[in-house]
C-alpha cells in the first residue's frame, strides 16, 4: 500500500493493481488531484520501459474497471504515464530500490521548521527513511511525506 495515500487513493490502488499487473506492468502509484476538473494519474512501469501504446492499453483496461466500480463521484480525467526521470516515490520499497539516489521531499508537517528537503536516500527502516542532507542524516516518517520525487541529473 502506498505511503500517505488518501482513502480514495488506497481504494483505487486496490481496485486497479490486478488489471494493470495482468497486462504485464507494474503499478508504480496513483495520484488523485482534486480541482475544477479532477485528475486521476496512474504511473506504470515495466522492465522494457513504457511507450504510448502501453499507456493506452492500461488506460482502456482501467477505464473499464472504473466504469463498472464507479468509485469517483466527481468528473475527472484519467492520465496514464511512465514515472519519468523525476519518478514519484509512493512506497517504502521505492525508497529502498533507489537507495543512494537523490530525492526531493515535501512533508505534511514541518521538521525543523522545514517542509521541503532534498538529499540522498541513505536507508529505509520500516516506516522511516534516512536522507543525507548537506552531509547530515535526517530521519523522516514515511507517513509524513506528502510528495517525493527522484531528482534527475543530466
UniProtKB/Swiss-Prot annotation:
**GO terms under cellular component:** cytosol
Described purpose of this protein according to its UniProt entry: Required for maturation of 30S ribosomal subunits.
Q: Which SUPFAM superfamilies match?
A: YhbC-like, C-terminal domain, YhbC-like, N-terminal domain
Q: Does the keyword Cytoplasm apply?
A: yes
Lineage at the top is:
Bacteria, Pseudomonadati, Pseudomonadota, Gammaproteobacteria, Enterobacterales
Checking InterPro entries in the record gives:
Ribosome_maturation_RimP, RimP_C, RimP_C_sf, RimP_N, RimP_N_sf
This chain belongs to which protein, by name? Ribosome maturation factor RimP
Kindly list the biological process annotations in GO that this record carries.
Answer: ribosomal small subunit assembly; translation
Tell me which species this is from. Salmonella newport (strain SL254)
Question: Where's it found, cell-wise?
Answer: Cytoplasm
Asked whether the keyword Cell membrane is assigned, the reply is no
**Location, primary (coarse class):** cytoplasm
Give the similarity note: Belongs to the RimP family.
**One Pfam family of this protein, by short name?**
RimP_N
- Keyword annotations for this protein? Cytoplasm, Ribosome biogenesis
PANTHER family, from UniProt?
A: RIBOSOME MATURATION FACTOR RIMP (PTHR33867:SF1)
Amino acid at each position: 500500500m502506498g505511503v500517505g495515500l488518501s482513502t480514495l487513493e488506497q481504494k483505487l490502488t486496490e481496485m486497479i493493481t490486478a488489471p494493470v499487473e495482468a497486462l504485464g506492468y507494474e503499478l508504480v502509484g496513483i495520484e488523485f488531484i482534486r480541482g475544477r476538473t479532477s485528475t486521476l494519474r496512474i504511473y506504470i512501469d515495466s522492465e522494457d520501459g513504457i511507450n504510448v501504446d502501453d499507456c493506452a492499453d492500461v488506460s482502456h483496461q482501467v477505464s473499464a474497471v472504473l466504469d463498472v466500480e464507479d468509485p469517483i463521484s466527481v468528473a475527472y480525467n484519467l492520465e496514464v504515464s511512465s514515472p519519468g526521470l523525476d519518478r514519484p516515490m509512493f512506497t517504502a520499497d521505492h525508497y529502498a530500490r533507489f537507495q543512494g539516489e537523490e530525492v526531493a521531499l515535501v512533508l505534511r508537517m514541518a521538521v525543523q521548521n522545514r517542509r521541503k528537503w532534498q538529499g540522498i536516500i541513505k536507508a529505509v527502516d520500516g516506516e522511516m527513511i534516512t536522507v543525507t542532507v548537506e552531509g547530515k542524516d535526517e530521519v523522516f516518517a514515511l507517513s509524513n511525506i506528502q510528495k517525493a520525487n527522484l531528482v534527475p541529473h543530466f
